[in-house]
Amino acid sequence: MAHRPRWTLSQVTELFEKPLLDLLFEAQQVHRQHFDPRQVQVSTLLSIKTGACPEDCKYCPQSSRYKTGLEAERLMEVEQVLESARKAKAAGSTRFCMGAAWKNPRERDMPYLEQMVQGVKAMGLEACMTLGTLSESQAQRLANAGLDYYNHNLDTSPEFYGNIITTRTYQERLDTLEKVREAGIKVCSGGIVGLGETVKDRAGLLLQLANLPTPPESVPINMLVKVKGTPLADNDDVDAFDFIRTIAVARIMMPTSYVRLSAGREQMNEQTQAMCFMAGANSIFYGCKLLTTPNPEEDKDLQLFRKLGLNPQQTAVLAGDNEQQQRLEQALMTPDTDEYYNAAAL
């Protein structure tokens, strides 16, 4: 296997400093070398345990330390989760992501988490979880249950991280990613733009991700969703071009990874989202809720896909089939009919 050269901070900084149109052109070239530019991977995210998190992440409404009006909920019943997964598949998602607001799962929760993974896989969906810190044994148990992806974001650069979170170290996050990788689970890891970080911090985040022993298969890039009651509620808005630039640099640095538009799409107009796809984004969360923050309504996503000529990617999985995704793609490509406008209800 050929040695993969490591990125340097100066190289990443040079990318961020490129004229935007030159950067977009390079990112689109890289994207087309590794992906079908018309295909977008579609995921649905469900909060399986909401609120009362002991962590102090300053951006997060689920922290018990902030008064955001969010009601805490217990871990959902397995069948409730699987019913949501069925609806996600019916709406065209190929990956179902389950997130829990805690620092780490307890051993008594593991059998239920394993059942959720097994049930999602039995439907023919890819299964993803984000549960906080994992032990080696927990990572292996989830792998044995069939978990495809584990999400654990680095959030920002190591240098800026302490300004945002103090209850979990940066190294703890890196250690969890290593345990997940060693268990044979694909890694999903990214960060947030708009925390108050500098461009150098954005470069530092992408440097950490790209220089992992194996870069993440999926890289979610979030735009801060400012929630009243959190310490970052009054942060400055993120300039759309700065966000697009971050997407483009991520694409160039991690050419074979899926780059996902995650939180914050509700704040983006269609033109900004279109430029993100041009910059190399090829994955979205699809649905009305992104954990506890708004996400564009499904039908708006389908209409945007139609305008841009994008198709939801079909994903081969060990269990189930892609009949639903084929029906959704057919609906997307049939404009001006009831089938198209009701594609989300298929």
Curated annotation (Swiss-Prot):
One of its GO terms (biological process) is biotin biosynthetic process. Its cofactor is [4Fe-4S] cluster; [2Fe-2S] cluster. Coiled coil: none annotated. GO terms for molecular function: 2 iron, 2 sulfur cluster binding; 4 iron, 4 sulfur cluster binding; biotin synthase activity; iron ion binding. PROSITE patterns: RADICAL_SAM. Gene3D superfamilies: Aldolase class I. Binds 1 [4Fe-4S] cluster. The cluster is coordinated with 3 cysteines and an exchangeable S-adenosyl-L-methionine. Belongs to the radical SAM superfamily. Biotin synthase family. Homodimer. This is Biotin synthase. It comes from Escherichia coli O6:K15:H31 (strain 536 / UPEC). The gene is bioB.
